[in-house]
């Protein structure tokens, strides 16, 4: 199963959000069985981060473990000392359509 996630960064906080992904989140995703497929910025909105995850197992269980991980809690707290770095997060679960082409 795939998950398309869209984050809107707080004004001026996109560098902090990307740093948290590079320094902490990517390794934590791997630890909890979530595979990063790709990361994008919309061409017309640099304050938005869109990314695609692949889940090997139940996404709900994986997210519960991720959100309870002490390393995640520490990274989140450290990155938000000066306030939240995201204004909103949207998540959609996607399934491939069997009889249509895919590169995934």
Predicted features along the sequence, with ranges:
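Generic secondary-structure transition motif, activating predominantly at the C-termini of alpha-helices
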Residues: 22, 67-71, 80-83
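Short, surface-exposed linear patches
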Residues: 25-31, 59, 72-77, 88-89
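Glycine-rich beta-strand-turn "strand-cap" elements at beta-sheet edges
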Residues: 35-48, 75-104
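A short acidic/glycine-rich loop-to-helix N-cap element
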Residues: 16-20, 63-64, 77-78
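Short amphipathic alpha-helical segments
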Residues: 13-37, 71
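Short, well-ordered beta-strand segments in beta-rich or mixed alpha/beta enzyme
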Residues: 2-8, 37-70, 90-94
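Surface-exposed interaction/gating patches
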Residues: 1-16, 28, 98-103
């Amino acid at each position: 199963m795939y998950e398309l996630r869209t984050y809107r960064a707080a004004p001026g906080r996109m560098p902090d959000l990307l740093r948290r992904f590079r320094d902490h989140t990517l390794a934590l995703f791997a630890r909890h069985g979530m595979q990063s497929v790709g990361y994008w910025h919309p061409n017309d909105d640099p304050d938005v981060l869109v990314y695609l995850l692949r889940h090997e197992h139940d996404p709900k269980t994986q997210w519960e473990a991720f959100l309870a991980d002490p390393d995640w809690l520490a990274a989140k707290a450290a990155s938000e000392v000066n306030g939240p770095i995201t204004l909103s997060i949207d998540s959609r679960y996607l399934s491939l359509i069997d009889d249509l082409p895919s590169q995934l």
